[in-house]
Amino acid sequence: IKDTFDRLGIPQAEQSSLAGVGAQYDSEVVYHNVRKEVEEQGVIYTDMESALNGPYAEMVHEHFMKLVPPTDHKFAALHGAVWSGGSFVYVPKGVSVAIPLQSYFRLNAKGAGQFEHTLIIVDEGADLHFIEGCSAPKYNVANLHAGCVELFIGKNAKLRYSTIENWSKNMYNLNTKRALVEEGGTIEWVSGSFGSHVSYLYPMSILNGTGAHSEFTGVTFAGHSQNLDTGCKVVHNAPKTTSIVNTRSISKSGGISTFRSSVVVTNKAKQAKSSVSC
């Protein structure tokens, strides 16, 4: 674990440019730390098991698997049955976290699955940048990643959620990510998909309050034997909501890169605007 951290430069990054770091190997969280000055702002950053059984349990239970219920699809049901690990973040009202939090997930076991759950709540007027990194060694048998991410962005709050996925080419990456954005709030998805044998990944933004905004920026690189099926979903469910979807894909050596986007505008979403570019 220490060697992997050193190769990734995480110890140096934690000291210089990260507000907190979490790490998960296979099904277990092995490290979690947050800077004292960030903790003093009231920011909570801990592993999911501790959050569910600690002083924040009521808040966690109110939000856990509410955006992605087990009935959503078969991999959500599998996740709900066997999940382990992941991160819980809460940013209090009006707090701006100046430097990012980061979680790193590594699936090290041969022929195994990883089912971490990430839950982030950014309260009214707060601001956070969260970075997620994923990797795994290469084996000659399939591995499965079916994690879940639930993001709650309060009134006039902002969350940037950045992901770099560099799984090995024996990985089936079937992650589900969803954000609920209230009035005047903003969710920014930044996604880089470079690894795995097969990926199906479509982060979803539900714009539930007047003036809520979603922006998705994605880059996909599919090489030999890779099938990367990615994109973004947006639901405009309130007036004057706006969304931008901007993606670029590269394929080489027979790799397959597929882009899918879905933008839904409900009857409540008067004067909604959306732009999709790929």
Language model segments and positions:
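Residue-level "edge-of-site" marker
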Residues: 18
